[in-house]
Amino acid sequence: MFMIKKKKNKNKFKKNINLGIAHIHTTFNNTILTITDLQGNTITWSSAGSLGFKGSRKSTPFAAQIASSTAAKAALEHGMLKVEVFIKGPGAGREASIRSLQASGLEITSIRDVTTVPHNGCRPPKRPRG
């Protein structure tokens, strides 16, 4: 028998970008963070689910903190220094992800809440009974 050698893709090249945008999407189940340049091209992304958190652990602030620090380290490798933050959603990881971005060395220039608010559209899901 013989082994098939896998070729490693080297399509991840280093970009020199000083200013970027961090899009943080927090839901009740997960936190997704995408860091883009000013044109909207994705530099790096991370989510709580992609880092191995499963089930209800994905929705914790700790999972959001780990996801945002992972994305911030990758953005720092691309030369990013400053970032604008657009945060969307009602999730638990809102503040934790912003704090983690700041602690990892990115300078936050502005924070915008772009959560969409319905003008009494769809009926919301039932409230959890606790």
Swiss-Prot record:
Give the protein's recorded name: Small ribosomal subunit protein uS11
GO CC, one annotated term: ribonucleoprotein complex
Q: Which GO terms describe its molecular function?
A: rRNA binding; structural constituent of ribosome
Protein's job: Located on the platform of the 30S subunit, it bridges several disparate RNA helices of the 16S rRNA. Forms part of the Shine-Dalgarno cleft in the 70S ribosome.
**Subunit architecture:** Part of the 30S ribosomal subunit. Interacts with proteins S7 and S18. Binds to IF-3.
On the tree of life, the source organism's domain of life is Bacteria
Supply the alphabetized keyword list: Ribonucleoprotein, Ribosomal protein, RNA-binding, rRNA-binding
Q: Which cysteines are joined by disulfide bonds?
A: none
Q: Which family does it belong to?
A: Belongs to the universal ribosomal protein uS11 family.
List the GO biological process terms: translation
Keyword Ribonucleoprotein included in the entry's annotation: yes
